[in-house]
């Protein structure tokens, strides 16, 4: 987890220096093909996270409800939130951030009563496995690429790392609580070890039986923020590049995902399971190098024009 966060920190440093002072709006207007690529990529990523929300909701909260019933309020909320622009998105996410984060921290604190410190002790390690695991965790952070879309418009200096450091501490807390509660072997074979950890946590006095609901809410809200972010930035890339593409882009993303909800839960889910690592690692590579190349090309052309 620590190595993955270090990799993510290096990623942010690259973005900070490559995109500083350059609005991605201008870059996409110059390279229109890039706007189309971003729209298609972000639509696929949005479908993936939409699938995650539907899966979590149907499995843990509303098992008898259809995907259309669950998906409609999600897409409507995402649309209303995104129509207000980046500022409104930020305010909405600020409003729900502590609402879901504090219960998660509470669950992690209670889980400490069940920790086995022997399970957390490192008695041997393999450098290759640690590197592979670190790269996988880093790849799972691929929505970090959103920073390319607003770094150039930031006027208050370099990217601050305080919130990123807090995220690393949160990841370490989830990791320690899960492995310390379930043990290494069970964590490796359990398909959803974090949920199993939360289900084993008990509140003193038995006041509340299902503390895993806090964790479910955290995952759903967190995934929703990423899902709506992909739809927002995908449509923003089209809106700023093609003057008549906004309505078409909105219809294909919000309406299209809703119409094909059953397909997403069946065929698309099968593809994701089969090619999961291709999807994750491909996103990581493209999300880093594609915008980096675009911004470097922009800087070179601007420099040549001045000469």
Language-model segment annotations:
Residues 242-249, 261-285:
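Extracellular/periplasmic helix-loop-helix junctions in multi-pass membrane proteins
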Residues 46-54, 98-123, 291-305:
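Hydrophobic alpha-helical segments and their helix-loop junctions in multi-pass secondary transporters
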Residues 182-211:
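Membrane-interface interhelical connector segments
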Residues 1-69, 73-76, 285:
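Membrane helical hairpin/interfacial module
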Residues 52-58, 75-96, 152-155, 271:
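Membrane-water interface regions at transmembrane-helix termini and the short interhelical loops
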Residues 68, 81-111, 279-290:
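Membrane-interface loop-to-helix entry segments
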Residues 2-14, 39-49, 77-81, 97-112, ...:
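Selective recognition of specific alpha-helical transmembrane segments in multi-pass small-molecule
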Residues 3-11, 38-42, 46-49, 70-73, ...:
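Hydrophobic, membrane-embedded alpha-helices of multi-pass small-molecule transporters
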């Amino acid at each position: 987890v620590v190595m993955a966060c270090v990799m993510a920190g290096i990623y942010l440093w690259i973005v900070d220096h490559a995109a500083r002072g350059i609005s991605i709006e201008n870059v996409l207007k110059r390279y229109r093909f890039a706007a189309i690529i971003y729209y298609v990529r972000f639509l696929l990523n949005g479908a993936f996270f939409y699938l995650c929300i539907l899966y979590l909701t149907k499995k843990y909260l509303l098992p008898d409800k259809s995907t259309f019933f669950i998906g409609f309020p999600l897409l409507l909320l995402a649309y209303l939130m995104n129509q207000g622009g980046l500022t409104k998105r930020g305010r909405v996410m600020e409003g729900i951030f502590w609402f879901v984060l504090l219960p998660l921290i509470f669950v992690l604190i209670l889980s400490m009563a069940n920790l086995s410190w022997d399970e957390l002790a490192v008695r041997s390690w393999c450098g290759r496995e640690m590197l592979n695991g670190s790269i996988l965790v880093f790849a799972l952070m691929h929505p970090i690429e959103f920073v390319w879309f607003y770094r150039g418009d930031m006027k208050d200096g370099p990217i601050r790392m305080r919130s990123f450091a807090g995220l690393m501490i949160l990841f370490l807390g989830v990791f320690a609580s899960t492995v310390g509660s379930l043990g290494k072997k069970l964590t490796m074979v359990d398909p959803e070890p974090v949920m199993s950890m939360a289900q084993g946590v008990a509140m003193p006095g038995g006041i509340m039986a299902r503390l895993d609901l806090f964790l479910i809410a955290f995952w759903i809200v967190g995934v929703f923020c990423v899902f709506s972010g992909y739809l927002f930035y995908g449509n923003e890339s089209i809106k700023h590049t093609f003057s008549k593409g906004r309505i078409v882009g909105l219809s294909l993303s919000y309406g299209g995902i809703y119409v094909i909800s059953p397909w997403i839960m069946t065929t698309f889910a099968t593809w994701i399971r089969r090619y999961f690592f291709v999807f994750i690692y491909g996103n990581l590579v493209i999300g880093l190098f594609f915008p980096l190349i675009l911004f470097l090309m922009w800087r070179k052309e601007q420099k040549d024009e001045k000469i």
